[in-house]
């Protein structure tokens, strides 16, 4: 509602699904398709500039923002909070809700974030995050893999990392500044 109050046209989804709707699909695929369909709806609206669509989320929502930004080039600005990490960290300290067959042998999360380049990306992680979760030091390690891609594409100004004073949450002022600047 905060973004809507600021004048943005928003679609707010609740990504709480932890079981498959169809047996031959992956949970992440189903979640991502739902979000892509939201973008499909947005681009049909006369009030929406299709070149100025952003996405944002925290935790599982931050993961889904990562996936949507990576897989749908209509997203021009992605804000992913409480999720910049490594698969090793999540494997040891979190639920398996992020995992699907084969993902670990192919990529790490930094590789998926790299697919957003050269488009705009802001990642946020809280300095008061739980020690076993999405900590700033681990986020900085993942960022070391993302930054060179933005550099190679001459888009370093399109990559932001905000280690904020909070915990597992969105730093609202920096998110608003990011969208005000880029959308």
Tell me the role of every PLM-derived stretch.
Residues 52-54, 77:
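Residue in the alpha/beta-hydrolase core beta-strand immediately N-terminal to the catalytic nucleophile
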Residues 14, 56, 81-82, 124, ...:
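Alpha/beta-hydrolase-fold catalytic nucleophile elbow
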Residues 116, 123-125:
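Short beta-strand/loop motif that positions the catalytic acidic residue
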């Amino acid at each position: 509602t905060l973004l809507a109050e600021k004048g943005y046209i928003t679609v707010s989804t609740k990504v709480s699904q932890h079981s498959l709707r169809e047996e031959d699909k992956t949970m992440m695929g189903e979640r991502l398709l739902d979000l892509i369909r939201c973008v499909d709806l947005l681009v049909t609206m006369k009030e929406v500039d299709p070149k100025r669509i952003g996405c944002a989320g925290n935790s599982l929502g931050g993961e889904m923002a990562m996936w949507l930004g990576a897989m749908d080039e209509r997203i021009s600005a992605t804000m992913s909070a409480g999720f910049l990490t490594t698969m090793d960290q999540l494997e040891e300290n979190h639920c398996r809700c992020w995992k699907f067959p084969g993902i670990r042998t192919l990529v790490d999360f930094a590789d998926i974030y790299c697919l957003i380049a050269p488009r705009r990306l802001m990642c946020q992680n809280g300095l008061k995050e739980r020690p076993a979760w999405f900590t700033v030091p681990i986020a900085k390690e993942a960022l070391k893999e993302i930054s060179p891609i933005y550099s190679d594409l001459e888009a370093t100004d399109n990559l932001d990392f905000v280690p904020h004073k909070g915990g597992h949450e969105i730093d609202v002022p920096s998110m608003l500044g990011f969208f005000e600047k880029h959308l």
